[in-house]
Amino acid sequence: MCIRDRIRTYLKNRTNLRLTEIVTMAGGEDCKISKTQIMDGIIPIERHGIDRHSYVFCIGGGAFLDVIGLSAATAHRGVRLVRFPTTTLAQDDSGVGVKNGINAFGKKNFIGAFAVPYAVVNDFQFLYTQSDHNNRSGLSEAVKVALVKDGVFFDWLEENVEALHALKPAALEEAVERSAILHARHIALGGDPFETGSSRPLDFGHWTAHKMEQLTDFELSHADAVSVGVALDTLYSARCGWLAEEDAWRAVGLLRGLQLPVWHESLDLRDGEGRRLVYRGLEEFREHLGGELTVLMLEGVGQGVDRHSVDEALHEACIEELKTASQEGIPT
């Protein structure tokens, strides 16, 4: 049975809901740079008289959820959105969040809005429609949140790395569920769901990731960029003396064990004065949140700490170290 038939069957037996239209649109990161896709999401809402007591069901990956979420948040200043994330990355992270947005001016999520979804349905069946690479790469956010929030979960990821690499259903589904719960719990109980302050621990490694995505014209996936960013800031935390060296290499080893990248060639791009372009991402990251630059680093597995500067020379040494490890194929 195709997805359209499944949707119709699901809603047929729910007499209090009336299906108006099933709309298929393009997904992937390209949809976040489209100048028309937000309106493409709004037009059916207007056409069918969808009101603030109606629902938009959105089925897709993280980028698609971001765009249609913004459409729903904008129409009537907010139509109820029910998310059905279809990828590992969306199910274990962004799908349970409160952010919606698109890329603009070459910057990640420059246009967007905070809007709490009415509901999120993580159906594991969707994961088995994805490529092996997509399913593995989405685990970068699980590694991230474990490093920041839950050392026991990190230990579990290490212990189950072979099963996760092989995409064994029981391991994959448990990793996704535990990651989603940690993300949702922080948003709901962390005290700043709409990021009015200057700290955002769930964006560990993301200042690098977002800039690398931009430098590659968004050809580098968010999941892979996060893997590199997490590896870099974890090693940097150790080089600054905040995190044990052994723990830093445990994290890098876990990412490598999941067949995820810990370095990317975009890190070698430099301006005319020889400064790595990725470091422009620090100011863009600060501007996006506002206030003082605040980047999360690690002082233990499962324990993050806010810092307000990055020593570029020391960080560069980490880039070079991970580049060497990556080129030599060392599963550190």
Question: What spans do the regions from the language model cover?
Answer:
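Glycine-rich beta-strand-to-loop/alpha-helix junction loops that act as flexible
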Residues: 27-28, 59-61, 204-205
